[in-house]
């Protein structure tokens, strides 16, 4: 039997998956220096980091599409970690942005429903990380709104209400949570440098999110092995002894 035939007849090498689910702040996270790309680099040869960010989406729409993204599967097909990062659009002011706005109570219910759905497809709460929306720099975002011909359609105080609701859902459901809204404003610091336009993350904001998310994510993936041996550990005379079967890790 050839080496190719032996490899084909053996077990498939499955990469554990970390799934990032959110709005534009997640969609843009794979740009250069983005928090998603930083995670992918940190977890290389341990996990595939999947970007499932949808610009402009809110929890009302997210709840509908989640079952299309994650379904019950055997073992390693289930994500080892899932981030749920919504609220920046839900917290839009109803009068100024009714399409994206989601009432606070519904926002909480949608987050709960998504956590419950994940549990139903064998992604337990211990694998889930909720992330609150970041604070809003109203002065910078108002300039963006004016350029688009509309009024200021978000307020930081309102975003804070949604952040608090996200925290409460995490407490109720027993998931981890990253309180980005509070951390970026800690000790009344100027958080504007964390944002590129008052709403989305700047390079500094991406790094801030990455550094604060890592401790939560490490609890879920630190025990995972490096996939396939280090090159110096590959058997020189018969590399298949290292690269097939039990030599995967």
Curated annotation (Swiss-Prot):
MF annotations from Gene Ontology: hydrolase activity, acting on ester bonds; identical protein binding
SUPFAM superfamilies: SGNH hydrolase
EC number(s) on file: 3.1.-.-
Keyword Disulfide bond applies: no
Catalytic residues, chain numbering: 24, 197, 200
Key words of the record: Hydrolase, Lipid degradation, Lipid metabolism
Modified residues (N6-succinyllysine): 63
Site (Transition state stabilizer): 56, 89
InterPro entries from the UniProt entry: GDSL, Iah1-like, SGNH_hydro_sf
Keyword Hydrolase annotated: yes
Swiss-Prot/TrEMBL GO biological process terms: gene expression; lipid catabolic process
Cited Pfam families: Lipase_GDSL
Recorded family membership: Belongs to the 'GDSL' lipolytic enzyme family. IAH1 subfamily.
The protein's role, per its UniProt record: Probable lipase.
Name of the protein described by the UniProt record: Isoamyl acetate-hydrolyzing esterase 1 homolog
């Amino acid at each position: 039997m050839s080496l190719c035939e032996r490899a084909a007849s053996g077990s498939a090498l499955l990469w554990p998956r970390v799934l990032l689910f959110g709005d534009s702040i997640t969609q843009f996270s794979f740009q250069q220096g983005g928090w998603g790309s930083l995670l992918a680099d940190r977890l290389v040869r341990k996990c595939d980091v999947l970007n499932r960010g949808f610009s402009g989406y809110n929890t009302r729409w997210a709840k509908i599409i989640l079952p299309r993204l994650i379904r019950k599967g055997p073992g390693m097909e289930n994500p080892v970690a899932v981030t749920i990062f919504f609220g920046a659009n839900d917290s839009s002011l109803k009068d100024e942005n009714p399409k994206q706005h989601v009432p606070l109570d519904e926002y909480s219910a949608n987050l709960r429903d998504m956590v419950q759905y994940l549990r139903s497809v064998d992604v337990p709460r211990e694998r889930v990380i909720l992330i609150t929306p970041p604070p809003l720099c109203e002065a910078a975002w108002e300039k963006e709104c004016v350029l688009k011909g509309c009024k200021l359609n978000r307020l930081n105080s309102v975003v804070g209400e949604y952040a608090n609701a996200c925290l409460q859902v995490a407490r109720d459901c027993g998931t981890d949570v990253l309180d980005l809204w509070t951390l970026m404003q800690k000790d009344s610091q100027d958080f504007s440098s964390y944002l590129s336009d008052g709403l989305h993350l700047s390079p500094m904001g991406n790094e801030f999110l990455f550094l604060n998310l890592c401790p939560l994510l490490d609890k879920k993936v630190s025990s995972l092995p490096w996939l396939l041996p280090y090159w110096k550990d590959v058997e020189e005379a018969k590399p298949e002894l290292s690269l097939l079967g039990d030599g995967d890790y």
